[in-house]
Amino acid sequence: MKKYLFLCLLAAHPVHSFASDQLNGTVWKTIDDQTNQPRALVRFNEDKNGALSATIEKVLVPSEANKCSKCEGAYQNKSLVGLTIVKNLKSSGENKYTNGSILDPKTGKTYSFNATLSPDGKKLSGRGYIGISALGRSQTWYKVK
């Protein structure tokens, strides 16, 4: 019985690590869900605990404000480039990521965040929400080669 349990745990561990690795180090073009226009390039990185974060590397809208003027606290008036907008996103199975948070620099609001990676690894469908997911907003981001 102990051998069976050990083998099950051993087999499950690489799948979890691989799932996080699918996003780790990748760059994505964010698309505004209201205008359908590209907004920024963000890079995902994994911390020592396996949680993923995403940081803005480049703002794609020339007229976009360079600072997070509506953000509060430590993020107030911080440059958008270098701003971490996704935090604590964790792999929860094949191509699924949950329990994260996302900051909308346009409004300064933070939402709960879940995401699903497409089977071909080229699209990331994310949903930001407060309370229940049904009352949130969705965006699809596209992997940059």
Q: Model-found features: residue ranges?
A:
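Intrinsically disordered, glycine/charged-rich N-terminal periplasmic/extracytoplasmic linker segments
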Residues: 1, 14-17, 141
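Sec-dependent N-terminal signal peptides
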Residues: 4-13
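The N-terminal extracellular segments of secreted preproproteins, especially immediately downstream
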Residues: 7, 17, 67-70
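N-terminal helix-cap/turn-to-beta initiation motif at the start of protein domains
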Residues: 16-27
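Exposed loop/turn and edge beta-strand positions of beta-sandwich/beta-sheet ligand-binding modules
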Residues: 22, 38, 135
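Central antiparallel beta-sheet cores of small beta-barrel/beta-sandwich binding domains
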Residues: 25, 30-113
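Edge beta-strand at a domain terminus
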Residues: 123, 129-145
